[in-house]
From Swiss-Prot:
Keywords: Cell inner membrane, Cell membrane, Ion transport, Membrane, Potassium, Potassium transport, Symport, Transmembrane, Transmembrane helix, Transport. This is Probable potassium transport system protein Kup 2. Belongs to the HAK/KUP transporter (TC 2.A.72) family. It catalyses: K(+)(in) + H(+)(in) = K(+)(out) + H(+)(out). GO terms for cellular component: plasma membrane. It is found in: Cell inner membrane. Its main location: membrane. Residues 1-21 are annotated as: Disordered. One of its GO terms (molecular function) is potassium ion transmembrane transporter activity. It is a multi-pass membrane protein. It comes from Rhizorhabdus wittichii (strain DSM 6014 / CCUG 31198 / JCM 15750 / NBRC 105917 / EY 4224 / RW1).
């Protein structure tokens, strides 16, 4: 991202604690947040507590271990979700937007030219790469764990679990192109009912065994580690499943605002979750060991009386579908941001709602996710097996968030290092402990999100590096505009109409203009050199949308500024531009684009295999014509070769 773009972003300023740009009454925003933000963390009770006692490193379901695990879950929620994300990280918004890429864009303004800048950018990109691995596992484990509840209704349902889960997931991905704006209105009320049910079921069992409430004392977590050091460390790999989805609170801040999300977490979601976890523990503690060993394989659904288990399965399935929808929508949003920030090649993006700018659909991401999610379900077959693959990507991303927030505290907010260091040390210690515990899962399935993360990281960094090299090569070969204008106007024939030459750089003469003059020997009476720039902010105000310069002799330079959450529409902006003569008439305007063909070279800038990978990505990127919404019958593409 350029310093010019950062300057545009800085015009509005940014300060800690920005409340977001969501609109609506507080009550409506709280209900909306419950329906979208908390789906992932809200479905964790289906498998998190179970996995510590029936997973790959099972603990005996006795009082020491149950109270220790419950204490770890509670204090993890308090430290990681409440303190780290709600109290600290959610104050580091980028003009109201949250998420790793928004935070990275915010930091980028202060990191240019700094020694640590490149490392921080790579960390942020890796967090984005890990997100794609997580977005494949979340729908698979959530829906599968809910459908597995059918076996608590009738054991004979077991063979039907896999096909039902696959059918639900396929249907979910198939409807994405139609958008979810209409059914999305039901997400909030459904999740409100779901969380209320969690709390009621948990409270019912806590009343029967209130002794379980002593687990809220951190001493029981400490005692767990003192008496069962290795087992307690391994158990953290399952305990962390209770806080997966915490990063969604920050990522979705732009949609609902910091206050509604924080309020709904503290007042409603956190109590409901903890009541349910404590209820599961109370139920197991009330049973003899033989019964407990059977119950622990599905304690969530066994909280309900037998006659209510089928309705609970249906409700839980609806909740997991909503959680999966939030993850899929998040993947679309993150991809759009990454495209605008220059980490992913242009992809086809369609809007599924005329009334909501955030309702988008990216076919390539949708079908790619669907294939991988179905493969995961068919390969791992049970949610318990999938739990072994879950967590490592989340804990890795959380650790990176800690690194990014450290930069924000010291370099953006100006905290004293002596004050920031202890806070960051606590966050880092927790993140490292959870990440280390999850590394033990690598042989059992943890390799999958790491593999996806490294593949995505390779693609993201290859595109980012290749794109920068290509821009630099084009800039090196560019002719100064002043020289071109002085020489061309005296030798070229001028024809009626307007020619718009798009270029990625706001300096020099576009290659498409040079090629057009070389082959056609004419210039239009009005020539626009147009650059679209993406700022380090999510949105750019209309007053700063267009920068204009009159170059003389009928030549004009126009720079259109967009935020990384905005959808470029070049004709719409040009139709409102009055700075370079009469208004634009599309039927009198031609758009000239350069289509670059890459020639891999022996230059040391990139390895040959990465040059070839970048060339393949460039060939398969969506054309600038479609991405910038240019009228197809007014576009001329001119080829050029670039050696990087």
């Amino acid at each position: 991202m350029s310093s010019d773009a950062a300057a545009v972003a800085d015009r509005d300023g940014s300060s800690p604690g920005h409340g977001g740009h969501a609109h609506g009454s507080l009550g409506a925003m709280v209900v909306g947040a419950v329906g979208v933000v908390f789906g992932d963390i809200g479905t964790s009770p289906l498998y998190a507590f179970r996995e510590t006692f029936a997973g790959h490193h099972p603990l005996p379901p006795d009082e020491l271990h149950i109270l220790g695990v419950l204490s770890l879950i509670f204090w993890s929620m308090m430290l990681v979700v409440t303190f780290k994300y709600v109290a600290i990280i959610m104050r580091a918004d980028n003009k109201g937007e949250g998420g790793s890429l928004a935070l990275l864009a915010l930091i980028n303004r202060k990191s240019e030219g700094k020694r640590w800048g490149k490392g921080i950018i790579l960390l942020g990109v890796f967090a984005t790469a890990l997100f794609y691995g997580d977005s494949m596992i979340t729908p698979a484990i959530s829906v599968l764990s809910a459908v597995e509840g059918l076996t608590t209704v009738e054991a004979g349902f077991a063979p039907m679990v896999l096909p039902i889960a696959v059918g639900i997931l396929i249907a979910l991905f198939m409807i994405q192109s139609r958008g979810t704006a209409k059914v999305g209105m039901l997400f909030g009320p459904i999740m409100m009912i779901y969380f209320t049910t969690l709390g009621v079921l948990g409270t019912w069992h806590i009343i029967g065994n209130p002794h379980v409430l002593i687990a809220l004392n951190p001493w029981y977590a400490v005692r767990f580690f003192m008496e069962e050091g290795t087992l307690a460390f391994l158990a953290m790999g399952s305990v962390v499943l209770a806080v997966t989805g915490a990063e969604a609170l920050y990522a979705d801040m732009g949609h609902f605002g910091r206050r509604p999300i924080g309020l709904s977490w503290l007042v409603f979601v956190l109590p409901a979750l903890m009541l349910n976890y404590l209820g599961q523990g109370a139920m197991i503690l009330s049973q003899d060991m033989a019964t407990a060993l059977r119950t622990i394989h599905n304690p969530f659904f066994l909280l309900a009386p037998e006659m209510l288990r089928l309705p609970l399965v249906i409700l839980a399935t609806m909740a997991t579908v909503i959680a999966s929808q939030a993850v899929i929508t998040g993947a679309f949003s993150v991809t759009q941001q990454a495209i605008q920030l220059g980490f992913i090649p242009r992809l086809r993006i369609t809007h599924t709602s005329a009334g909501s700018i955030g309702q988008i659909y990216i076919p390539a991401i949708n079908w790619g996710l669907m294939v991988m999610v179905i493969l995961l379900v068919m390969s791992f077959r049970t949610s318990s097996n999938l739990a072994a693959a879950y967590g490592i990507a989340v804990t890795g991303a959380m650790a990176i968030d800690t690194c990014l927030i450290a930069v924000v505290l010291i370099h953006l907010w100006g905290w004293n290092k002596a004050l920031a260091a202890p806070l960051i040390a606590v966050f880092a210690a927790v993140d490292i402990a959870y990440f280390g515990a999850n590394l033990t899962k690598v042989p059992d399935g943890g390799w999958f999100p790491l593999l996806i993360g490294f593949i995505a990281f390779t693609l993201l960094t290859t595109w980012g590096r290749g794109r920068m090299l290509m821009i630099n090569r084009l800039r090196e070969a560019a002719m100064p505009v002043k020289v071109f204008v002085q020489s061309a106007v005296n030798s070229a024939v001028r024809v009626p109409g307007t020619a718009v030459f798009m270029t990625s750089q706001a300096q020099g003469v576009p290659h498409a203009l040079l090629h057009n003059l070389k082959h056609n020997k004419v210039l239009h009476e009005r020539v626009i050199l147009l650059t679209v720039k993406i700022a380090d902010a999510p949105y750019v105000p209309e007053s700063h949308r267009v920068d204009f310069a009159d170059l003389g002799q009928g030549f004009y330079r126009i720079v259109i500024n967009y935020g990384f959450m905005e959808d470029p529409d070049v004709p719409a902006v040009l139709s409102r531009t009055r700075t370079c003569g009469p208004e634009f008439k599309m039927m009198d305007t031609s758009f000239f684009l350069a289509r670059q063909t890459l020639l891999p070279s022996e230059r040391p800038a990139m390895a040959i295999w990465r040059e070839k990978l970048f060339a393949w990505m460039l060939r398969n990127a969506e054309s600038a014509m479609e991405f910038f919404k240019l009228p197809t019958n007014r576009v001329v593409e001119l080829g050029s070769q670039v050696e990087i």
